[in-house]
Swiss-Prot record:
Keywords: DNA-binding, Nucleus, Repressor, Transcription, Transcription regulation. GO terms for molecular function: DNA-binding transcription activator activity, RNA polymerase II-specific; RNA polymerase II cis-regulatory region sequence-specific DNA binding; sequence-specific DNA binding. Acts as a negative regulator of transcription. PANTHER family: SOX TRANSCRIPTION FACTOR, TRANSCRIPTION FACTOR SOX-21. The keyword Iron-sulfur does not apply. InterPro entries: HMG_box_dom, HMG_box_dom_sf, SOX_fam, SRY-related_HMG-box_TF-like. GO terms for cellular component: nucleus. It is found in: Nucleus. This is Transcription factor Sox-21-B. Disulfide bonds: none annotated. The gene is sox21b. Coiled coil: none annotated. It comes from Danio rerio (Zebrafish). The keyword Transcription applies. Pfam families: HMG_box (PF00505), SOXp (PF12336).
Length: 245
C-alpha cells in the first residue's frame, strides 16, 4: 500500500491553546483519570472563565490561524469520517419460509416448487394468504378448508337450534350445577369418582364425585391464526351454541 500523504492538522482554537497546558497538569495530578473525563472537566472550567481571562488565548488562536494560512494556502478541512456499516433492512415485514412451495397443501396447478416460491417472495400478500391457507389445512378438516367462513357463520346455525336446547356450559368445561344435579338424581348408581384440574393451579387435580361429563359440555379445541399486523386475540369463553356446530 502506498503511504498516505502527511496529514495537515487544523489550527488550534482558543480552547485548545488554553487546555494544552491544563490537560498536562490535570493528567499529572490524576494519573488514573481517563482522557474523556479530563476533557469534560476542562470544558466545564473553560466555560467558567471570563472574557478577559479568555482574551489572551483567543488572540493566540488568531495568530496561529494566520500562520497556518500562510504555510498552507490551499488547505481545506476534510474530516476523516469512519465508514458507517450499512444495515440491511428486511425485505419483508414478516418471515417467509424458503421451502414454502414444497408443502403439499401449497402445490397448485402443477407449478414447480421454485416458480411458486419466487412468485410468493415477489408478492408479500400472496405469501401471507398462502401461509394462512396452509395453516387452515393443518388445523381444520378438508371441508372447512374449502370454505373457512362456514365455521364463523353462526347466524345460520342459530336458527337450527331450538331455545330449550341451549344448555350453557361452564367456561372451564366443567358440567353445570343443574346438569350434575340431574345426573346424580336420575342415575345415582352411575356416579363415579374422578378428578378435575384445579382452575387456580393447573398442576393439581381436584377429586370429584359428580356424574360423568355430558357430551354437550365437551368443547372442541379452538386454534387462532395470527397474520402480520394482527395482535393476539383475547380469549373468551367458548359459547355452548358454537360447540354444537
Amino acid at each position: 500500500m502506498s503511504k498516505p500523504m502527511d496529514h495537515v492538522k487544523r489550527p488550534m482554537n482558543a480552547f485548545m491553546v488554553w487546555s494544552r497546558a491544563q490537560r498536562r497538569k490535570m493528567a499529572q495530578e490524576n494519573p488514573k483519570m481517563h482522557n474523556s473525563e479530563i476533557s469534560k472537566r476542562l470544558g466545564a472550567e473553560w466555560k467558567l472563565l471570563t472574557e478577559s481571562e479568555k482574551r489572551p488565548f483567543i488572540d493566540e488562536a488568531k495568530r496561529l490561524r494566520a500562520m497556518h494560512m500562510k504555510e498552507h494556502p490551499d488547505y481545506k478541512y476534510r474530516p476523516r469520517r469512519k465508514p458507517k456499516t450499512l444495515m440491511k433492512k428486511d425485505k419483508f415485514a414478516f418471515p417467509v419460509a424458503y421451502n414454502l412451495g414444497e408443502h403439499e397443501a401449497l402445490k397448485v396447478g402443477g407449478l414447480p416448487a421454485g416458480a411458486l416460491t419466487e412468485s410468493l417472495m415477489s408478492n408479500p400478500d400472496k405469501a401471507a394468504a398462502a401461509a394462512a391457507a396452509a395453516a387452515a389445512r393443518v388445523f381444520f378438516n378438508p371441508s372447512m378448508s374449502a370454505n373457512p367462513y362456514s365455521f364463523f357463520d353462526l347466524g345460520s346455525k342459530m336458527t337450527e337450534l331450538s331455545p330449550p336446547s341451549f344448555s350453557y356450559a361452564s367456561p372451564l368445561g366443567y358440567p353445570t350445577a343443574a346438569t350434575a344435579f340431574s345426573g346424580a338424581v336420575g342415575g345415582g348408581a352411575h356416579t363415579h369418582t374422578h378428578s378435575h384440574p384445579s382452575p387456580g393451579n393447573p398442576g393439581y387435580m381436584i377429586p370429584c364425585n359428580c356424574a360423568a361429563w355430558p357430551s354437550a359440555g365437551l368443547q372442541p379445541p379452538l386454534a387462532y391464526i395470527l397474520l402480520p399486523g394482527m395482535g393476539k386475540p383475547q380469549l373468551e369463553p367458548y359459547p355452548a351454541y358454537a360447540a354444537a356446530l
